[in-house]
A protein has these predicted regions:
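A generic structural signal for ordered alpha-helices
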Residues: 5, 12-13, 23, 53, ...
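Catalytic strand-loop segment that frames the active site of acyl-thioester-processing enzymes
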Residues: 25-66, 71
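Small-side-chain structural scaffolding
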Residues: 27, 43-45, 74-80, 98-99, ...
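Helix-adjacent hinge/juxtasegments
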Residues: 60-77, 81-90
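Short aromatic-glycine motifs in intrinsically disordered, low-complexity regions
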Residues: 13-25, 91-92
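Hydrophobic beta-strand-centered segment that forms part of the acyl-chain substrate-binding groove
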Residues: 2-12, 79-107
C-alpha cells in the first residue's frame, strides 16, 4: 500500500493536487500548475495571469502590472511546494518565509 507521500509525488500537478499540499486557497493561491519537479534542483510552476485579476483594477489603471509582492508570494509558494515535496510526509508540515532581504521591484 502506498503512503500518502508516495501518492502525492508525481510528475505534474494541477490546482487540485497543489491545494492538497499547500495551505493557501483562493484568492491567494498563486500557483495554477506544476509541470516538473527535480528534488534538490528546481520546480517549474505556472501562474496563469489574465487582465481579469482584481488587482489590475488599481495597479495601475490603463497600464496593468502584476504587483511585485504577489510575484514574490508566488515564488514563496513554489519554494514551499518544493520543500514539502522533499519531505516523507508533507501533509504534517507547513513552510513559511520569515523574511526577504535585498529585493527590488522595477520596470
Amino acid at each position: 500500500m502506498k503512503t500518502m507521500s508516495e501518492e502525492l509525488k508525481k510528475d505534474k500537478y494541477n490546482i487540485q493536487d497543489i491545494i492538497k499540499i499547500l495551505p493557501h486557497r483562493y484568492p491567494f493561491i498563486l500557483i495554477d500548475r506544476i509541470d516538473e519537479v527535480k528534488p534538490g534542483e528546481f520546480v517549474n510552476a505556472i501562474k496563469n495571469v489574465t487582465i481579469n485579476e482584481p488587482y489590475f483594477q488599481g495597479h495601475f489603471p490603463g497600464q496593468p502590472v502584476m504587483p511585485g509582492v504577489l510575484s514574490l508570494e508566488s515564488i514563496a509558494q513554489t519554494t514551499a511546494f518544493l520543500m514539502l515535496y522533499e519531505l516523507d510526509d508533507p501533509l504534517k508540515k507547513n513552510m513559511f518565509i520569515s523574511g526577504v532581504d535585498g529585493v527590488r521591484f522595477g520596470v
